[in-house]
Amino acid sequence: MGKIIGIDLGTTNSAVAYLSGLQPEIILNAPSGRLTPSVVGIDEGGTVLVGATARELQVVRPDRCVSLFKRWMGSDRATILGGKSFAPEELSAFVLRSLKADAEAYFQKPVTRAVITVPAYFNDQQRKATVAAGRIAGLTVERILNEPTAAAIAYGFQGVGENKIVLVFDLGGGTFDVSVVEQFDGTLEVRSSAGETSLGGEDFTRTMAARVLESVGLPFERAEATLPLVVSRVVQQCERAKCQLSRELTATIRVPDATGDLAAGKEVVVTRGQLEAWVTPILARIEQPVRRVLADARLTREKIDEVVLVGGATRMPVVVNRVRELFGREPHGLLD
């Protein structure tokens, strides 16, 4: 029948895994990383780049690259790259094809079957687009699995004889998904789900970049239009600084000069407190989906047995603290 792989097709990063017995194992990509950036680019020679190489190109040639296209799945939005038009499912197919190649290199044989995760709130069109992306990539999609169900399984909430109500709080790079999952008699069922397709860690990064640029006299929107190389370099540094500020209290960002030269630029020091103040208005947008998901499941927060954190943005202390405040309990931390 052939090996079935599991794919997390994410907004900012994707991953591929398989079951070794009953234990899931991540398959490393060509650069020996666990995550493949969900970025597609076309270089000057017309070669399609995917993952880390595309992300590197995006820093210096943002006009030749695209990311966050998961937000457009199921729509008719087209993206022009290298003079060609691509639908969202075609862009996703490039990422899936790259993950498929990594799996084939690992197993040393063809891989044609996959299970792909999607947000629980994805509608029928978005799910069909995901299946279509798999087909374009040469994969038979055996099943579309809701991300909160996959997360609950990963945290071990599937024991026979246990009955629990689990809230899965998934704040990734580009999307926010909150779901109530009921565990009963060894099965898992999503009782309710809500979220935002345009809310995630990328929004925190761009907000940080805007404040850093403003601090040196460059309004963000004007800089995006006139100095795209400067903006892309600052965004790249802000992404790294955001991760650093989850562990440390300060981070330094260097704003390049108009030519993109970092050495000739200015240094800006950002504190964790500043970052948290900047992103708090954005983080407030999680509250309405949380209220809605509890109301749809006809539950109060006191009826939630466990809270599970999923997605890279939940590594930020400000996010963990807000979840703790919302539910009055310590959430399960992010799994590697």
Describe each region flagged by the PLM.
Residues 1-75, 79-85, 104-336:
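Oxyanion-binding/catalytic loops of NTP- or PPi-dependent enzymes
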